[in-house]
UniProtKB/Swiss-Prot annotation:
Component of the adaptor protein complex 2 (AP-2). Adaptor protein complexes function in protein transport via transport vesicles in different membrane traffic pathways. Adaptor protein complexes are vesicle coat components and appear to be involved in cargo selection and vesicle formation. AP-2 is involved in clathrin-dependent endocytosis in which cargo proteins are incorporated into vesicles surrounded by clathrin (clathrin-coated vesicles, CCVs) which are destined for fusion with the early endosome. This is AP-2 complex subunit beta. The modification N-acetylthreonine is found at T2. The modification Phosphoserine is found at S4. GO terms for biological process: aorta development; cardiac septum development; clathrin coat assembly; clathrin-dependent endocytosis; coronary vasculature development; heart development; intracellular protein transport; kidney development. Pfam families: Adaptin_N, Alpha_adaptinC2, B2-adapt-app_C. It comes from the Eukaryota. It comes from Mus musculus. It is found in: Cell membrane; Membrane, Coated pit.
Amino acid sequence: MTDSKYFTTNKKGEIFELKAELNNEKKEKRKEAVKKVIAAMTVGKDVSSLFPDVVNCMQTDNLELKKLVYLYLMNYAKSQPDMAIMAVNSFVKDCEDPNPLIRALAVRTMGCIRVDKITEYLCEPLRKCLKDEDPYVRKTAAVCVAKLHDINAQMVEDQGFLDSLRDLIADSNPMVVANAVAALSEISESHPNSNLLDLNPQNINKLLTALNECTEWGQIFILDCLSNYNPKDDREAQSICERVTPRLSHANSAVVLSAVKVLMKFLELLPKDSDYYNMLLKKLAPPLVTLLSGEPEVQYVALRNINLIVQKRPEILKQEIKVFFVKYNDPIYVKLEKLDIMIRLASQANIAQVLAELKEYATEVDVDFVRKAVRAIGRCAIKVEQSAERCVSTLLDLIQTKVNYVVQEAIVVIRDIFRKYPNKYESIIATLCENLDSLDEPDARAAMIWIVGEYAERIDNADELLESFLEGFHDESTQVQLTLLTAIVKLFLKKPSETQELVQQVLSLATQDSDNPDLRDRGYIYWRLLSTDPVTAKEVVLSEKPLISEETDLIEPTLLDELICHIGSLASVYHKPPNAFVEGSHGIHRKHLPIHHGSTDAGDSPVGTTTTTNLEQPQVIPSQGDLLGDLLNLDLGPPVNVPQVSSMQMGAVDLLGGGLDSLVGQSFIPSSVPATFAPSPTPAVVSSGLNDLFELSTGIGMAPGGYVAPKAVWLPAVKAKGLEISGTFTHRQGHIYMEMNFTNKALQHMTDFAIQFNKNSFGVIPSTPLAIHTPLMPNQSIDVSLPLNTLGPVMKMEPLNNLQVAVKNNIDVFYFSCLIPLNVLFVEDGKMERQVFLATWKDIPNENELQFQIKECHLNADTVSSKLQNNNVYTIAKRNVEGQDMLYQSLKLTNGIWILAELRIQPGNPNYTLSLKCRAPEVSQYIYQVYDSILKN
């Protein structure tokens, strides 16, 4: 008879009977009684009153009975901590039992009893088990240390268990090694700064040796540990990859994904032009494809991970697109994932196959899948320009099916295609308008309204179409209302005489009858714009639209890099970092991809998580591309006594918050105007997306002896009709100066000098007019010191410290660019308190930390600290670790950004390691350049 009989009893008063049976002299009776107790406990009955009687049954040689008693103990020890102490002697005795299975069982149960009162009694038995002659006992004891650490971390450290764990990494048994690694990794997760694992080439070699002989779980533990190691160079990275690659052919999909994670991380360190790099990319494809032949649930997990891999390195699977074609019997969750990856892999070479598949999918019966397929056709058109016409034709065929949800989704994606390829496919608008009456979804209605408004001049009855939407204005969603408002304003600007009544009607509905603040605000903006300056309104509302990006749903680069570090875990399925869904008392250590140390000369950007990925993204909406155009379009009239600024024009532009609006209306400050009449600059709110990053602040200063970059020629005479300008930037008495030398190499004299800066990353502008009062005669030079401040408008530049300047004289207007060395923007109050420094360092995410090498520097730590302090870089603390001098430093920029630094100096080694952390990591490479310049001059 099976053990199910223990779960079928309905007796009353059975506790008393069980108590008697537990104390029976016969072993079999006691064993039966314990089974009944466990069964009662399993179904939720309270049998805690039997605790002392069950504990008495521990004194037995029967392994099955001992397991049952231990199970009972684990369940009730927390609610009966005082009685749990009764079992301590039995644990100690069992840990010395000749049977290794009993020793291991005892130590495993010890780790599972989470009672503070008895942990101290368990230290000695655990210490013996960690050095036990039997590997099964040692591997069980290793896991017990991690469990004990979670209960009482301080005691584990004091008792030296962590050192014992580290010793087990060199154990002769691979499973002991794997469990020791698993335990140390878990402890390290909760104490990220402890460096418990102490990964070095020797330990890594031991782990790789154990890898081949472990069980599947052991291999996963070791591979996960390897993924946290940063090899010292690409040769070591390649060596590890060669020994991990065989795991790709493992039968267990978890082992395969763990191996892929290691290889994806180490690919960052391999030179991209090497044969091995390309060979490794080819080796990664087959195992990923094989994962898609498993069960649907395994396929889904594999596809979610492949989605990340394809975003990071699409070249791995670019030849394997057919395996992502949907099968008729795939579950919907697998179909949607495959569809997403298909689009990511779509290219000119395979677009015909992809489109044929998508058209077929669009005739399926599953509504969600069909919608996604139609949307995918639009994404193909946007991504692969050569296929756009074929995609539009396919969408028109689908619209002809008259299936409601297909038509609506098709109209939404055609709107995006119009945005991507303006004035190319407008001939299909008539076909779209035929389906107006069938549109009942907000997205589709908004898309159709946008199309009618954008191409109103090509649609004869555009006013009637928009008026039909206006009839139920208050019943529409906010999205449709906003789109309709803009569309009617566009229509009015294109056909003012015919639509005046219509535009007044929609403005009245938006501003007077609506409770939605967004709608009201937009209505008021349009109303004031139209009534104040219709010409400007036309320029604003009908301006050329920025192109839409090819991939709108790519994961943000730094998050993608973090998720690559979590391949094979729940984070890679959710596409969220662990701290977004795991609550822990210690928090979660953020991971990031290793930094390639191939090039660290001054001026080079580190190939890190932030810098590379941002540079690789296609920049569709320009952030500074038109800025030089802004300077070129400046209307520079002759110098006047008082600079005129058109308040009406500037007001209109400010109202619309244009981040790229031109500098028209901001006249030059001529040199003839006395400083007292110069307009005082006011901080401008610029819609550039950087206001939070670059908060404008005042107060700058530099200690005497600060570094000054050598003068450079900014404007050669051959490009400026004989005017040559060279210069640099300095800090004196707490002010920033632009030190310039003007040389006249022309044959005529020069007068009426004026200067203006374009918007820049730090809001740098002249504090006073350019003061050159006497004519500059041929072959004459003059030195000019122009005071600057940081109160001007902010616009992110590329590079970040780029400054675009316009200089005018009686001959012409000339333009040049120069780079501001960031040390002139370091402020005097950049010294942090020690506690604040420590808290801030921990608070800034680890992916924001970038490392650089400062080469060929022969200064000691004190000299370095003194030199940097002269430039407002303050040393907060200094300590010596294993012969290395560690300087912890802080500095602050004029816009309020704090940068924290750790500088490692090894006496006798001319190469210093600089680690920088700040909330705006794009600044770090420029700070590194400043460090390099200061310490080498």
